[in-house]
């Protein structure tokens, strides 16, 4: 059951990771209007077992052998009183999609995501990952000879509970950013560093 909590906030179980699936598929729907203009093929995968070893992403990335991969997941919103922002960072519900930076993230993909967000006036937050993430990005970037990988997160309160809370503005921003990022890619892009 989905409950409306305010104008743009909703509570439900399993936003992790239904929200990410929605964002990817909606971005693909919007991109399909521009498919004649795209310089490459866009492929989407809804993976399984991300929470228990990222097995679905591992096999999918190996089979597809992409040049660029973008994992879309949720990120812990830390905007509640008992959360230590110094330890967990400051991610706010309703303040935009989270663009992660860290050891699994290709810096050129990160920069392109930020450029896309700024070009389209899409609100975003930066998530700092000090070690490999527990997301599909962790294994996508290691597939075959390596994949230039980015990670987007939808801020989510009360993750892994029956009462997760998400903001529709963050979800819409994620959709727009995926579509804008994908539309900006060219076959000639070099993501090596």
Enumerate the predicted regions with their spans.
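Glycine-rich phosphate- or other oxyanion-binding loops that anchor nucleotides, phosphorylated ligands
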Residues: 1-3, 12, 49-56, 117-120
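Acidic-glycine-rich active-site phosphate/pyrophosphate-binding loop
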Residues: 1-4, 84-85, 148-153
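Active-site-adjacent substrate-binding region
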Residues: 91-175, 180-193
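Alpha-helical metal-binding/catalytic segments enriched in His/Glu/Asp
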Residues: 7-51, 177-181
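Acidic, glycine-rich active-site loops and adjacent beta-strand->loop/helix elements
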Residues: 2, 42-52, 74-76, 131, ...
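Short glycine/serine/threonine-rich phosphate/pyrophosphate-binding segments
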Residues: 18-21, 52-56, 134-137, 161
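Active-site loop ensemble at the mouth of alpha/beta enzyme cores that anchors a bound cofactor
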Residues: 66, 83-96
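A glycine-rich helix N-cap at a beta->alpha junction
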Residues: 60-79
């Amino acid at each position: 059951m989905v409950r409306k909590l305010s104008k743009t906030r909703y509570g439900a179980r399993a936003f992790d990771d239904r929200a990410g699936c929605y964002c990817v598929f909606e971005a693909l729907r919007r991109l399909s209007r521009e498919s004649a203009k795209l310089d490459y093929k866009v492929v989407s995968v809804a993976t399984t077992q991300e929470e228990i070893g990222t097995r679905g992403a591992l096999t999918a990335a190996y089979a597809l052998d992409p040049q660029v991969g973008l994992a879309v997941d949720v990120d812990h919103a830390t905007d509640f009183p008992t959360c230590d922002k110094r330890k967990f960072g400051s991610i706010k519900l309703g303040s935009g999609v989270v663009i992660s930076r860290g050891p699994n993230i290709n810096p050129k993909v990160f920069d392109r995501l930020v450029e896309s967000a700024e070009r389209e006036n899409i609100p975003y937050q930066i998530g700092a990952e000090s070690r490999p993430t527990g997301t599909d990005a962790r294994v996508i970037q290691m597939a075959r000879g390596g994949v230039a990988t980015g990670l987007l997160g939808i801020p989510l309160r009360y993750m892994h509970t029956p009462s997760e809370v998400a903001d529709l503005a963050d979800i819409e921003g994620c959709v727009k950013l995926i579509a804008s990022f994908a539309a900006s890619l060219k076959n000639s892009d070099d993501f090596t560093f």
